[in-house]
């Protein structure tokens, strides 16, 4: 008889696909050969995403793992009339629900569980119809999960726009949250993206469990609040499995190190500020000029800045950066004036290799959770510059809850604009040896490095949570659908 399989349904984003594949492989190892993994592949909506996913699938298939297989779902029509990328993705996934149902029902082997992405709550309805336990893989923080679960209650309790509230918002397990730190989906309650956010919080209550890419020691108070039902007004929440950090580390290249890494080799320890705004991070010319001015005036601090160019196609879902034309983007003479202490890199850079380098002492990041986990893993303190989605809430978590970041003042109403003087102040605060604020952030970052690594060791909290998840899936048994 064929092994029971865990069906995994990821979306195509860089911070979603590979962590779910890594989690699937860990399930295989934890089951001791009792389970297999079947990955359902939705067609990516952009050519660049399709190329990335195809390359990742090819690498996995070439690795020779017998117990992980990939199945392609048929294409669906792209939605129109949406008000945000979250709603757009969610509507694509709802269109795929019949395809997911057919793919699972057509499997020859018994099905032990369905693990869906954060956006895939329609798939939980499919799992319920088929009698299969449904889990959500949550690639964000437990703090963000607490906010999501709390959102239906907030929706009923707060009558005005959240930004019009007097005082902070109370999320159990967290310090008081200023409305300015809320995700972009919560800032306009008249938009359908807000309705999607609240509906997602309700939908998660139908899950058998939620698998979170965090370590228990990083967010103990939040995880306790979720487990106690304080985020869901006394109603028991699904079991939460904090199994992170789940990070993918590709093998080192056989050729010589990347040029950015070679440049770092020549710099003193903990002396370089690394600036990178994610795979989709785009900075308009005014922001580029402010960053350049701040770096010039930052007291001689070294920097490595990944600066990307504008996309060829700016339609929804097509915001893919291009290689930057530095002479066109940067102020005249900037590269010459900072020669020797700064490197501006105009295309993709190996972020993990850079953060792992001993020369890196600080990280200006867009606050995507994957990038945050990488900085925590390598013990690099942060200057948070959120751009979109839940990133402002992540920035709040880094500063107020985890303590690994120096706050950076910005004008969210001006597209998250940061003045050069404010960035200069924050850079000096993070990087100067004499800065008390920087010392505290560096010390906390070093602590989180040790916490993250201990958590994933055998017997650590994340390893234990993952084994508990695996045991729970095996214990529940599998359903022969076909």
Swiss-Prot record:
Signal peptide: none annotated. It comes from the Eukaryota. GO terms for molecular function: UDP-glucosyltransferase activity; UDP-glycosyltransferase activity. CDD domains: GT1_Gtf-like (cd03784). Transmembrane segments: none annotated. One of its GO terms (biological process) is anthocyanin-containing compound biosynthetic process. Belongs to the UDP-glycosyltransferase family. This is Malvidin galactosylase UGT88C3. It comes from Oryza sativa subsp. japonica. The lineage of its organism: Eukaryota, Viridiplantae, Streptophyta, Embryophyta, Tracheophyta.
